[in-house]
């Protein structure tokens, strides 16, 4: 076999290993706390309770994760990319009016709730793992919170170095983790095979009919088994649909099923093991090693949501829902490996506060469920708008029925968690509302600024024709004017002519456009149009998962259009620096205008975001009434 064919054969395995390490870290560590959170509600734990809850848990895994996410939602890809914002772009494509606004609001709120998830996952995962030392010895209980804080501090501290090197270990670590789950659970099931009856959905239905109110409230805890389901969809672009599906059905689902059944088997024999059924499955001689492995696995799970928060923020910036932020690439090879210092610092502070405030994983469980079910519900509604598109007749009706049933399940899960708002669910709700408000305020403010500039616009073609007829003094070199709308005269050009009364020999009007697809092919990167004898328009296109690099794009333009003269040392960039002031009849309320102004002042400067050399930039200040 040739080297190339060997590489081709090994690639699916490598992708599957990567999916195990990144995609399934969150859902793979759920057994640490899920069953305990479900069954602690029962004062007198009976076999019927254990088997009923196990049956509900198993069939939710099958319906929500296996069927909804792995088989259906993964079909809704935006050129291979997944995630809430990618799904939002598909949902609004070709739509307008109130329906478009409705989907935008849903998608943005779903993305906002993800930040709550990104804060809770590291806290609850690491806490639940280190709580295992309390099983080893109760004298170690006071060390649980300090050790969790140390692990989390170390995790966030290494983010700036990138996850490339550590990431190579994630796959093998999670293979060992899932194998351990299967072995521990399988051994317990072997000792108490009666637990296997929980795989029969009759037990779930019987439990629901016997304890209807308890069953509904219990959904708020059972949903913890589904945490990380969104990661399957969000990380589709990294590993592809086939690898994610193979990893789920070949290893993750069997291991999780055995682990949950194993905990149930242990509880059937010894209901007092409810204090920590996961760690009590292990023999005493292996407890310390299991605590260490669990801690590493929860670090992997935490890394997945931290990286996810970085990716979601970059997409929000590119799509115009968030101000520009510093984005650092931590790998010269993998363009998806990025680091956002401000996001990392905010997440770290939030996670540390959560650990210090809630102090154990059981207290955090209520907060976790609300964030998870909220995001899942938003995804289902958007999928309802995307997946049936293009279908007709019976096929479309089939899609609507299936998605309708799944939507009802998500509504039930979300509704059950509403009752836990006072227990901790308020935290992700508060985070979601704050982030949603900030994102919508930024989008609204930018739209108002664009409308004001459009209202005061001067047609570019007409203006440049006048300059050619009545030319001002010319200076050597090329001036690049950054503009939102290439059809209108940039304010920076007007200010330059007003104050400096000169124009460069060559003028390029440059716009950046972000498409609703993740990546743009190099041959479609830019378009150029001549405006006058000495001026041109250029539009540079990027996908919402790409980082703008203006000098590199202009290098490509210069190769194709040498007459523009874009030699770096003879090129100056003219940018507008806008300051927002109150208008007599403001278009925004005072508090929103204050928030928008604060976000604008603290956004990353255009020079850094677009990678423009600072020594080649001239900024023209201007005030805009809002």
UniProtKB/Swiss-Prot annotation:
InterPro entries: K+_transporter, K_trans_C, K_trans_N, Kup. The keyword Plastid does not apply. It comes from the Bacteria. GO terms for molecular function: potassium ion transmembrane transporter activity; symporter activity. Signal peptide: none annotated. Pfam families: K_trans, K_trans_C. The keyword Cytoplasm does not apply. It is found in: Cell inner membrane. Keywords: Cell inner membrane, Cell membrane, Ion transport, Membrane, Potassium, Potassium transport, Symport, Transmembrane, Transmembrane helix, Transport. Belongs to the HAK/KUP transporter (TC 2.A.72) family. Transport of potassium into the cell. Likely operates as a K(+):H(+) symporter. HAMAP family: Kup. This is Probable potassium transport system protein Kup. It comes from Bordetella avium (strain 197N). The gene is kup.
């Amino acid at each position: 076999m040739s080297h190339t064919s060997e590489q081709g054969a090994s690639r699916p395995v490598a992708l599957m290993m990567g999916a195990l390490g990144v995609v399934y870290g969150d859902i793979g560590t759920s057994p640490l706390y899920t069953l305990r959170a479900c069954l602690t509600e029962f004062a007198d734990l009976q076999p019927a309770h254990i088997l009923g809850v196990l049956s509900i848990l198993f069939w939710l895994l099958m319906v929500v994760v296996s069927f909804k996410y792995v088989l259906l939602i993964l079909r809704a890809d935006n050129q291979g990319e997944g995630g809430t914002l990618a799904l939002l772009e598909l949902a609004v494509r070709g739509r307008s009016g109130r329906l478009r606004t409705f989907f935008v609001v849903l998608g943005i709120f779903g993305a906002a709730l993800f930040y709550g998830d990104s804060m809770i996952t590291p806290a609850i995962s690491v806490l639940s793992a280190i709580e295992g030392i309390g099983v080893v010895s109760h004298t170690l209980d006071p060390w649980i919170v300090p050790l969790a804080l140390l692990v989390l501090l170390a995790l966030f501290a290494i983010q700036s170095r990138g996850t490339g090197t550590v990431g190579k270990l994630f796959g093998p670590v999670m293979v060992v983790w899932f194998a351990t789950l299967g072995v521990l659970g399988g051994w317990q099931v072997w000792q108490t095979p009666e637990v296997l009856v929980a795989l029969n959905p009759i037990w779930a239905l019987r439990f629901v009919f016997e304890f209807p109110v308890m069953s509904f409230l219990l959904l708020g805890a059972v949903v913890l088994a589904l945490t990380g389901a969104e990661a399957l969809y969000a990380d589709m672009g990294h590993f592809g649909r086939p690898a994610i599906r193979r990893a789920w059905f070949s290893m993750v689902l069997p291991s999780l099923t055995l682990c949950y059944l194993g905990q149930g088997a242990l509880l059937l024999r010894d209901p007092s093991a409810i204090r920590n059924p996961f760690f009590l499955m292990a023999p005493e001689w292996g407890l310390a090693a299991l605590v260490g492995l669990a801690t590493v696995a929860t670090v992997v799970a935490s890394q997945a949501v931290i990286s996810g928060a970085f990716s979601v923020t970059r997409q929000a910036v590119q799509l115009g829902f968030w101000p520009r932020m510093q984005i650092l690439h931590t790998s010269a090879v993998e363009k998806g490996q990025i680091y956002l210092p401000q996001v990392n610092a905010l997440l770290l502070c939030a996670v540390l506060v959560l650990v210090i405030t809630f102090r154990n994983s059981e207290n955090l469980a209520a907060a976790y469920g609300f964030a998870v079910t909220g995001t899942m519900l938003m995804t289902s509604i958007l999928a309802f708008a995307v997946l049936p598109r293009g279908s007709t007749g019976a096929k479309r009706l089939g899609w609507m029925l299936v998605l309708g049933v799944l939507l009802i399940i998500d509504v039930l899960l979300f509704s059950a968690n509403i009752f836990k708002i006072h227990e901790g669910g308020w935290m992700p709700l508060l985070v979601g509302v704050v982030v949603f408000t900030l994102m919508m305020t930024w989008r609204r403010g930018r739209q108002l600024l664009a409308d004001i500039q459009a209202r005061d616009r001067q047609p570019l073609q007409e203006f440049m024709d006048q300059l050619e007829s009545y030319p001002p003094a010319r200076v050597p070199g090329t001036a690049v004017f950054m503009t939102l709308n290439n059809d209108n005269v940039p304010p920076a050009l007007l200010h330059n002519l007003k104050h400096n009364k000169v124009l460069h020999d060559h003028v390029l009007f440059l716009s950046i456009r972000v498409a609703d697809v993740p990546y743009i092919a190099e041959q479609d990167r830019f378009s150029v149009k001549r405006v006058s004898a000495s001026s041109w328009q250029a539009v540079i296109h990027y996908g919402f998962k790409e980082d703008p690099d203006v000098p590199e794009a202009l290098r490509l333009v210069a190769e194709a259009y040498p007459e523009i003269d874009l030699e770096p040392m003879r090129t100056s960039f003219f940018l507008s620096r806008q300051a927002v002031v109150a208008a007599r009849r403001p278009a925004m309320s005072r508090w929103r205008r204050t928030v928008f102004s604060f976000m604008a002042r603290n956004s990353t400067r255009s020079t850094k975001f677009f990678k423009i050399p600072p020594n080649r930039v001239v900024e023209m200040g201007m005030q805009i009434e809002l």
